[in-house]
């Protein structure tokens, strides 16, 4: 898998594709529209693709909010946040007051989850 990143531009209030990373200068080139911008790397706003896609074919990135139906209990639907992990993408309940457990996203079939937003969206359906 070729690493793919996106970046939340706080100044532009939008998500942008990362087209280059310069580790020597600690900066990114982002492309929110048709004009490229160079910004300093801020890991809080940098999100890597998991390489997975939801039931609608939407690519899943760290920081995405997914709505998931559990295969064992068709009645339970939860909202989860995709969490950074050096080994494989994990998901944790969006409401951490319920539990702080995390689960391996690869364990679930794409038919069970759908991207509904990301951690920077103000409103998640």
Predicted stretch roles:
Residues 1-125:
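Secondary-structure transition motif
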């Amino acid at each position: 898998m070729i690493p793919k990143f996106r970046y939340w531009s706080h100044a532009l209030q939008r998500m942008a594709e990362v087209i280059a990373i310069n580790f020597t200068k600690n900066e990114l080139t982002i492309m929110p529209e048709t004009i490229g911008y160079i910004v300093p790397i801020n890991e809080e706003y940098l999100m890597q693709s998991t390489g997975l896609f939801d039931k609608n074919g939407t690519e899943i990135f760290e920081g995405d909010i997914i709505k998931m139906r559990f295969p064992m209990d068709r009645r339970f639907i939860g909202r989860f946040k995709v969490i950074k992990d050096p080994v494989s993408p994990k998901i944790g309940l969006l409401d951490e007051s319920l539990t702080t457990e995390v689960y391996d996203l690869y364990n679930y079939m794409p038919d069970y989850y759908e991207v509904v937003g990301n951690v920077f969206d103000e409103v998640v359906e």
